[in-house]
Amino acid sequence: MIELERIRGAAERARPHVYRTPLMPVDGALLKLECLQPTGSFKVRGFFAAALALPEERRRAGLITVSAGNAAQACAYAAHALGVPCRVVMYETAPATKIDGVKRWGGEPVLMPRPAVLDWLTNRGWESGPEAFIHPFADPEVMAGHGGLGLELVEDVPDLARVVVPVGGGGLIGGTASAIKRLRPEVEVIG
């Protein structure tokens, strides 16, 4: 589990750049509307938290990540807002909307065939450039930033009993569950 102070610090760093999203009641449940974030997903929380945790000199060199989806856009958006360059390694088959989203925020998509992306990851290809690599879901600061969502749920829903979290790479549930369990261990978190 991620430490509560790390989550609070990450959420505080990201706060000026993300929205505290509302909850919408639907059939007895509450939906956290992260689709209202600037890039349409929760990913901006983690990328701002991670980028702002970097030493300033390292951050100024730029950001780099690997993603064919929402993390790609979140990295580009965070870099744009912080005034630093960004490259995103993407599968050449990435959806055009995601490639365009990276470009819209001034990021540079680096399109590669799938085997080349996997080789780049295996061989730590990001070390050949000056940018700071932010893993799209396994970076501890990314997960802590996503934990801000859990903090908001605990604050906004006094009778919180159960939280259902979608799971892809695991960064969202890692951060959200850590925040919730640190504050309210009796709450059931389902992925």
Model region roles, listed by residue range:
Residues 1-191:
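PLP-dependent amino-acid enzyme catalytic core
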